[in-house]
Design a protein with these regions (language model features):
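Flavin-dependent oxidoreductase catalytic core characteristic
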Residues: 1-224
């Protein structure tokens, strides 16, 4: 009952972890920004990395050493993954936002003072991660990867367009946040406004999407 299963005992132990978690977010996003120039401007051609689902030793994940030289890591081009769906209105809008973001970071890069401003870096890092998430969605769409979070064989173009409507909206909100940063320069504020766009939402398609989601209500049952 209420007297036996109290929440406060759990809360007292868990609440102290929240500041640590928040600090981790800032640190991780600051580290992510080291990848930004090489990632956005990636033009090199590299062999495609296959999906592996075999039972193999993956201890290397936990023995990667210090986070040195992150800014020198090379990436394959991210754009082809998105361009295969650029005929979808929200994917096209998102690509335009990414181009505007690339122009911002290349022409109005963070100043030395801003590189010490965690609030500014957090907003910039969140904008950058949207591009990475979008690439992962497009690469996984329609792929069968049983037992993984990227198992999406049933994802249709309608699903992709609806997901990118969220990306477009989120990037716009983050751009407003960047525009309002106290340390932002006039040039950065002007460039941030170029990222603001409205997603394309078709009423009939939206209703079909909602109906599909509602059909999944109570479909999942927790294993015993």
């Amino acid at each position: 009952g209420f007297e036996e299963d109290t929440y406060f005992e759990q809360a007292a132990g868990h609440i102290r972890a929240l500041p640590k978690l928040e600090g981790t977010v800032h640190v991780n996003l600051a580290l992510v920004l080291k990848f930004l120039p090489q990632y956005l401007m990636a033009g090199g051609q590299y062999p495609e990395i296959p999906v592996r689902q075999d039972a193999a030793d993956d201890d290397y994940l936990f023995a990667q050493g210090p986070a040195k030289g992150l800014g020198k890591i090379a990436f394959g081009p991210w754009r082809p993954a998105l361009e295969q769906y650029q005929h979808l209105p929200n994917v096209a809008a998102f690509l335009a936002q990414v181009d505007a973001f690339a122009a911002l970071v290349m022409t109005q890069p963070p100043t030395p003072e801003q590189q010490k401003d965690l609030d500014f870096l957090l907003t910039l890092g969140q904008l950058f991660t949207q591009v990475v998430y979008a690439q992962l969605v497009c690469e996984a769409a329609g792929q069968s990867r049983p037992g993984t979070v990227s198992d999406m064989p049933g994802m249709s173009e309608a699903h992709i367009d609806r997901i990118f409507a969220v990306f477009v909206q989120d990037v716009s909100e983050m751009a407003v946040g960047l525009h309002g940063q106290a340390s932002a320069t006039d040039g950065q504020r002007a460039a941030a406004l170029a990222l603001i766009a409205a997603p394309t939402i078709d009423a009939a398609a939206e209703q079909a999407f909602v109906d599909e989601v509602l059909q999944l209500s109570d479909a999942y049952v927790m294993p015993e």
